């Protein structure tokens, strides 16, 4: 929170990455705006961006396991994001799990996110979906729209929305099944159309 408040006080723009749950998103923006106002700035002068871990995968069980690994990574580095939502960590300490199960370097960057997600399968699907967009193109479009609608209802407009691919795509990422082609073809048009219709 102190870093967010400081950013609100001095930055032209702030990117946040706090998962997909609106409570964590709204509380983070509130702190940024408080920092701006305490510094005598108009909060609207602070441009906002948001990053979502995005598991675009049509095999929902594997996608959910990868999302559980993402949730574990958030708990590992920012446990307050779990606490804010009333979530409990019902497993061993993340450092113990990483050491015993050979997760390297962490739950966000494991080379096998399905395997690392299986290690933290005590994380519920609800919890996993609070920290990542998960599923096929329709699932992700719906989840993203719900977040953006809630933000708009609270006076929040994001200048930039980044869908960070999970896992990292190969290089080069080419072809009709690639993340780089699927997102602009299957997700972004539907989201833009829905927003233009509902928000004018």
Predicted segments with their positions:
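Alpha-helical segments flanking ligand/cofactor-binding loops in enzyme cores
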Residues: 4-8, 145
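An alpha-helical appendage that flanks or caps ligand/catalytic pockets
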Residues: 25-156, 195-199
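Glycine-rich, proline-tolerant flexible connector loops at the mouths of alpha/beta enzymes
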Residues: 18-22, 161-180
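Short acidic active-site motifs
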Residues: 2-3, 59
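Active-site beta-loop-alpha junctions enriched in small/polar residues
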Residues: 1, 19, 51-55, 166-168
């Amino acid at each position: 929170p102190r870093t967010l408040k400081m950013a609100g006080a001095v930055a032209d723009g702030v990117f946040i990455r706090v998962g997909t749950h609106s409570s964590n998103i709204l509380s983070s923006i509130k702190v940024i705006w408080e920092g701006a106002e305490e510094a005598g700035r108009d909060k609207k002068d602070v441009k906002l961006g948001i990053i979502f871990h995005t598991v675009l995968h049509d095999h929902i069980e594997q996608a959910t396991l990868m999302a559980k690994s993402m949730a574990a990574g958030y708990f590992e580095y920012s446990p307050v994001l779990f606490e804010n939502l009333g979530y409990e960590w019902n497993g061993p300490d993340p450092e113990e799990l990483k050491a015993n199960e050979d997760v390297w370097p962490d739950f966000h960057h494991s080379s096998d996110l399905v395997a690392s997600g299986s290690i933290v399968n005590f994380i519920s699907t609800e919890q996993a979906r609070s920290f990542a967009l998960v599923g096929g193109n329709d699932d992700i479009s719906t989840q993203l729209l719900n977040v953006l609608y809630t933000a708009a209802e609270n006076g929040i407009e994001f200048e930039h929305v980044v869908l960070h691919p999970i896992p990292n795509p190969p290089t080069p990422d080419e072809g009709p099944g690639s993340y780089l082609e699927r997102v602009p073809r299957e997700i972004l048009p539907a989201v833009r159309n829905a927003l233009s219709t509902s928000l004018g």
